[in-house]
Amino acid sequence: MAKKMSSLIIIFNILLLLTTQTHAHNVTRLLANHPSFSSFSHFLTQTHLADEINRRRTITVCAVDNAAMSALTSKGYTLSTLKNILSLHVLLDYFGTKKLHQIRDGSALAATLFQATGAAPGTSGFVNITDLRGGKVGFGPDGGDLSSFFVKSIEEVPYNISIIQISRVLPSETAAAPTPAPAEMNLTGIMSAHGCKVFAETLLTNPGASKTYQESLEGGMTVFCPGDDAMKGFLPKYKNLTAPKKEAFLDFLAVPTYYSMAMLKSNNGPMNTLATDGANKFELTVQNDGEKVTLKTRINTVKIVDTLIDEQPLAIYATDKVLLPKELFKASAVEAPAPAPAPEDGDVADSPKAAKGKAKGKKKKAAPSPDNDPFGDSDSPAEGPDGEADDATADDAGAVRIIGGAKAGLVVSLLCLFASSWLL
């Protein structure tokens, strides 16, 4: 009986693992089913707000239709200002239709992405939601008029993401205020003057990456540039990369969103980079390490050691090492076990029998040391992610999916049959 119970516990744990849901929503895919919001979706992508929305849990997007967006874009706002305005329409809480009509005490203040950026003074980044007479729900910036109203629910993935339509763009003088002109910022000049000259010069020699950086700056950007010593040691490996891989690597070291240090510390988790494009994920993970902030991939971990600039829409941080994307470098070069000790001079096999007994002392080819060569074989393609991991992404509708898909379902079914037969 004890043996059966032990087996059942193992089966239960496997079932629990296979049926664990993964957070995965894609706001632009969800909006793709609704053509009347195509302009709103387009500017979520252009301002990189879509990336920020997709990586957050429990969020509400207050979308406006194409007519309302046309009225907004006709005012000639820069992309940075549009980003601030639209970020006021992203609530950091879940409000489905039911919750909107059942707000406690009839009114609630919701924090927004605009508030989270730190650019909103006081409570100007909060939105007031109030239940009005006749079933209406009004929206307005904190302290302002309730001039926009709930129209309908567009898409809901309960307690994950809710996309609702409101009647007009939320008016906010603070969000619509002019932002610093990013074109006036000399990216490479800032890097060169603060210990990242080698990286800056490398970026300048790559027209494709330089253009991507400059075009992304207006919408907000964070760069993680390796210090000069780290970059000098990496250059031989970089020079062995193909031209497309060089550009992808440089793009990987920048995130298409502005993050102050405080924001990085409060936004731990995976982030898309400028290199993120479809199947080529090129993600990095931000994680606190005490007062330090670390950046991780499957290949290595680096620490942020200095702030070069932190002025919206641009933040540049120096790192102690070169962060390596798994898409370009092999983990085996970093994670390989230490080489076996070389045999003593006297450890020479005198006979087949003796050799067999001393096989453990046989000299092996040394694996690259993480300290001396942490960059993998740049000429070889990196190993792709596990198939099961690929199955954990959102489907075409942008909804949550079960890990492993059909494969997991088959395994679960087999385990259930096994459990039933075992008990009988």
UniProtKB/Swiss-Prot annotation:
Protein family per UniProt: Belongs to the fasciclin-like AGP family.
Gene: FLA1
Keyword Phosphoprotein found: no
Occurrences of domain FAS1 (ranges): 25-170, 184-323
Keyword rRNA-binding: no
Cleavable signal peptide: 1-24
Stated name of the protein: Fasciclin-like arabinogalactan protein 1
Alphabetized UniProt keyword annotations: Apoplast, Cell membrane, Glycoprotein, GPI-anchor, Lipoprotein, Membrane, Proteoglycan, Repeat, Secreted, Signal
Membrane topology: Lipid-anchor; GPI-anchor
General function of this protein: May be a cell surface adhesion protein.
Positions bearing carbohydrate: N26, N128, N160, N186, N240
CC annotations in GO: apoplast; plasma membrane; plastid; secretory vesicle; side of membrane
Domain of life of the organism encoding this protein: Eukaryota
Region (Disordered): 338-393
Compartment list: Secreted, Extracellular space, Apoplast; Cell membrane
Lipidation feature positions (GPI-anchor amidated aspartate): D396
Expression across tissues: Preferentially expressed in flowers.
Organism field: Arabidopsis thaliana (Mouse-ear cress)
Residue ranges of the propeptide: 397-424
Comp. bias (Basic residues): 355-366
Gene3D superfamilies: FAS1 domain
GO BP, one annotated term: root development
Induction and repression of expression: Down-regulated by abscisic acid (ABA).
